[in-house]
Amino acid sequence: MEPIRVIESRTVVLPRENVDTDQIIPARFLKVTDKKGLGKALFSDWRYAADGAPRPDFVMNRPEAQGCSILVAGDNFGCGSSREHAPWALVDAGVRAVISTRIADIFRNNALKNGLVPVVLDAASHAKLLAAPGASVRVDVEAQTVTLPDGSTAQFPLDGFARYCLLNGVDELGFLLAQEADIAAFEGGRR
C-alpha cells in the first residue's frame, strides 16, 4: 500500500442509498484473487448494458468522471456481504476515498486494509457534496478533515490504528512484520 496523507480530486457523485457489495462488484467477478483489472467490473450491472456496451447515462461513464478519485455515495454504502473484492474494484478503478453518511462496518474494515479511505460525514456536509458533483474536494487523512466546495471543513472519524496504517502505507500484517524484532525480544525475555 502507498501512504495516504491527502487526496485532492474532483468528485463523482453516486447518490444511491444502500449500495451493497454485490452492486459494487457482482458475484460473477469474484473468482479471481488478483486485484488488477477488477476496476472494469466496478458497478458492472449499472455501467454496462447486457451487450457489454457502456451506458452513457451512468455517472462513472461520463467524461467528467474520468480521473476523479473521490466517490460521494448515498447513505449506507458497502452494505451486504463481506466481499473484499468491492474495495479492490474501487481502488483499481482509481477511487481513493468514499464519502457517505454511513459506511457498512465490514466494508469499512476491508477498505482500510486495501488503501481506500472510508469517510463518514455529517448529513449537512454530505448534502453539500451531493449538490456539487465534480467539485474539487480535499480529504486530509492526517487532520481527519474534508475541505468542502464552499471552503468549509468537516471532521470525520478514523481510529488511531487505521489512521497510522493509512499514513504509513501499511496494513495490519505489514504493521506486525515491522515489529518483528520487538516481538522476538519480548518472546526471548519470557524464556
UniProtKB/Swiss-Prot annotation:
Keywords for the protein's UniProt record, in alphabetical order: Amino-acid biosynthesis, Branched-chain amino acid biosynthesis, Leucine biosynthesis, Lyase
Molecular function GO terms recorded: 3-isopropylmalate dehydratase activity
InterPro entries from the UniProt entry: 3-IsopropMal_deHydase_ssu (IPR004431), Aconitase/3IPM_dehydase_swvl (IPR015928), AconitaseA/IPMdHydase_ssu_swvl (IPR000573), IPMI_Swivel (IPR033940), LeuD (IPR050075)
Any Pfam family hit: Aconitase_C
EC number: 4.2.1.33
Pathway: Amino-acid biosynthesis; L-leucine biosynthesis; L-leucine from 3-methyl-2-oxobutanoate: step 2/4
Stated role: Catalyzes the isomerization between 2-isopropylmalate and 3-isopropylmalate, via the formation of 2-isopropylmaleate.
PANTHER family: 3-ISOPROPYLMALATE DEHYDRATASE SMALL SUBUNIT, 3-ISOPROPYLMALATE DEHYDRATASE SMALL SUBUNIT 2-RELATED-RELATED
Family to which the UniProt record says this protein belongs: Belongs to the LeuD family. LeuD type 1 subfamily.
Official protein name in the record: 3-isopropylmalate dehydratase small subunit
GN (gene name): leuD
